[in-house]
Amino acid sequence: MRAVCGIDSVLARRKHSINNAFGGDTMLHSRDRILTTHCGSLPRPAELTRLYADRSAGKSVDEAALATLGKQAMNWVVPQQIASGIDIGNNGEQQREAFFLYVRHRMSGFGGAWNRRIFADVTKYAGYRAQQAAAHAATVAVSNTGTLPQAIGAVKYLDRAMVEAECDDFRFCLDAQENGFAEPFFTAPSPGIIAAAMLNAFYDNEQAYLDALGEALRVEYETIVRSGFLLQIDAPDLAMERHLTYQDRPLSDFLEFVERVVGTINRALVNIPRDRVRLHVCWGNYEGPHDCDVPLQDVLPVLLHANVGGLVLPFANPRHAHEYHVLEKLTLHPDQIIVAGVIDPLTHFIEHPEVVAERIERVVRAVGDPTRVIAGVDCGFDTSAGRGKVADDVVWAKMSAMAEGARIASARLF
């Protein structure tokens, strides 16, 4: 195993990247076999989760211990991904408490607290709602729906040092691996999910809030790409908010929101080539009825206006598994790839590799080109610390099943 690289080499890489603007290798395609990836968040150790939950609840925690545990967890999940057959992997989001809430530590303007509305499908089924509430009450976790901060002042990115350190830690870990990823990726949230989940109590209107968020997130997006990583923007808002914020409003109102967010994302990506970005969209990472979800065919036409090189969409869960057919009618742009969810992160069922292969092949038939399809997971395994449902050893078994399924599909497709 190679020694971990020193800070000088990291700084040299960063300087090289900056000097070359935002160029770099084109996003990987499945040139001679189906590649594998996932959506970002991976199971966190119990003690790390406890510290994140305590801090999120307003309790004082040992920040040095938290940082150490986060780095240790990241150093563990990277080789686990490699051993499980992941080609395009990341840091597991171990150094963040949740996929979007971490921005409150990197941006000004957030404070106070509020609670989000309840999902329409959760309200619809009282028995399920009671069961879910009991399960959450018994879990040590960071909530991404309750006691959330609000925008109470001007939102600005405070200091890129935090995201640079997170990128550097990931790079150090990658350099220590005998065999690394074919391509590393790094996640950051959509301005839309922050605008929806972290209530605007400062700006005159939603667009002004989105503009401020887009400008702040541009710092993070550009730093990630400058550091040599593929950027994944996590945007559940572009589907999920239909049955959350917009559950009592016309579909047209929701689609206008999607258009506003996509426009904001595009402006935030103005300096980044589209082939260095993929956009992850889903209907909410919870095991619920999901019978209030907006159909993919309604939102995909707007998503195709995003200036990104790939879309990451869920096709493994039983509510949306059929929607790969939408790709037959609403085709991707010629330069775009699709990361197709073929693994469900909300169940302990380990998908049979043949099932995975069949799911991959269905999407390939819809798209018409195996080189533009990558196998993935519907969503993260622990999008908010402690909320993950699948035990970590089963997570790695599911990843391995995906890799084997990709090999089976590749033998039939190439």
What are the residue ranges of the model-derived segments?
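Domain-level signal for soluble alpha/beta catalytic cores
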Residues: K15-F414
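Basic polycationic patches enriched in arginine
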Residues: R2, R13-R14
